[in-house]
Amino acid sequence: MANLVLDLELSGIEPGWHEIIQLGAALYDKEWNLKSTYISNVYPENRESFSLSSQKIHQLSLEELEDAPILHEVLEDFEEWLTKYLKHKSLRSLNICGQSVMYDIVFLKAAYRQEKKEWPFSNMLIDLHNIAFYLFEVLAKNGIKTPRSLSLNAIADFFDLKREGLEHNALEDALITGECLRECMNYTNILKLKA
């Protein structure tokens, strides 16, 4: 089963009021080999909801989003991109992955509802936050120093993964999350249960 790693940049934290302003995704096969990437800015139709505190995180201004496609166009383009790389398999054949991925899914589902589109994805989730929590507990109990935080940066630092650029965007976070998930899954080849 293929793995779709998502990350969204948002105009704020309240689904239904705040909006998706950038969608980034990385598509991996079941062995966590990167197959393709996707990124698009999204024009914020509710300009009142654009939060300055969120802008400090994603560093996208309203002016930069002025020429971005609207949400409906981005969702259509996103699904077309996925279908192309899935060789026309159903989008329900994907694991949806991310760092605290439920937060992104809540916003993405709200976007699908707003656009009166049916949710095309499965309910199969892989959450880096949860996997890292469990893995780090096991490693700590075996004497390996683990991060004190479960932030994406802390998990990435543990695996010696670094951001490529200085800018924070949804695609870079999706790629770093995917690489962290690959590293977590690599431990399944190392960790053994005692009989």
What do these predicted regions represent?
Residues 10-12, 130, 176:
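Short, glycine/acidic-enriched loop or turn micro-motifs at the edges of active sites
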Residues 126-145:
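Short alpha-helix plus adjacent loop in nuclease-associated cores
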Residues 95-102, 106-112, 141-195:
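Acidic, Mg2+-coordinating catalytic module of metal-dependent nucleases/exonucleases
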Residues 105-126:
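Substrate-recognition/cap helix-loop segment adjacent to the acidic, metal-dependent catalytic center
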Residues 1-111, 157-168:
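Conserved non-catalytic scaffold segment of RNase H-like nuclease domains
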Residues 84, 114-117, 137, 141, ...:
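General structural signal for alpha-helix termini and helix-helix connectors
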